[in-house]
Amino acid sequence: MIQLKNVDKIYETEAENVHALKSINLNINQGEFVSIMGQSGSGKTTLMNILGCLDNPTSGDYLIQNSNVSDLNDDQRSALRGLLFGFVFQSYNLLPRLTALEQVELPLIYQNVEDRKLKAAKALDMVGLIDRIDFKPNQLSGGQQQRVSIA
């Protein structure tokens, strides 16, 4: 279960403090699908960054399976992110010098996964890109880049 309790996120700038999230409360149960929708500038990306352990709230509690994520250090949050979350960024965040296979293999290196090349190749096959395994991002269409991110 994922819980947010009275979560605020404030970005401090020289000109002003921007209150991106105010008193957010949210419960997401295991197996539940959730869609985050709102106007531009409403805090969707900020919320997703917190939920994905990429950022911490300014105040409030973020709990995953009753453990407070804010109490974790960067390495612990990275490990949690690698185990529990999958991301498809708006810009896909592919590294320009890596092939499709290397892109998918990269997070597996940090998780010490054995047979990571084979697992990465299987993931690319599942999204229909086995024939593009050695292609770099500039050789892939936008849709193909997105599928590499999904893999």
Tell me what each language-model feature is.
Residues M1-A151:
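ABC family nucleotide-binding domain
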